[in-house]
From Swiss-Prot:
InterPro entries: Insulin, Insulin-like, Insulin-like_sf, Insulin_CS, Insulin_family. It comes from Alligator mississippiensis (American alligator). It is found in: Secreted. Heterodimer of a B chain and an A chain linked by two disulfide bonds. The keyword Secreted applies. GO terms for cellular component: extracellular space. GO terms for molecular function: hormone activity. Disulfide bonds join C7-C37, C19-C50, C36-C41. Keywords: Carbohydrate metabolism, Disulfide bond, Glucose metabolism, Hormone, Secreted. It holds the Pfam family Insulin. Belongs to the insulin family. GO terms for biological process: glucose metabolic process. It comes from the Eukaryota. This is Insulin.
Length: 51
């Protein structure tokens, strides 16, 4: 999958998709917004935020 910019609700939706029942840890201060919204991130990187 190509890297993509994901912001706000799009980012949360992507986390739900990637993490599924595991759930995820969403903290704007955790670097995910900087990584995925200000820059681009891959689904592989998103998985790092799953529980």
């Amino acid at each position: 999958a190509a890297n993509q910019r994901l912001c706000g609700s799009h980012l949360v939706d992507a986390l739900y998709l990637v993490c599924g029942e595991r759930g995820f840890f969403y903290s704007p201060k955790g670097g995910i917004v900087e990584q995925c919204c200000h820059n681009t991130c891959s689904l592989y990187q998103l998985e790092n935020y799953c529980n």
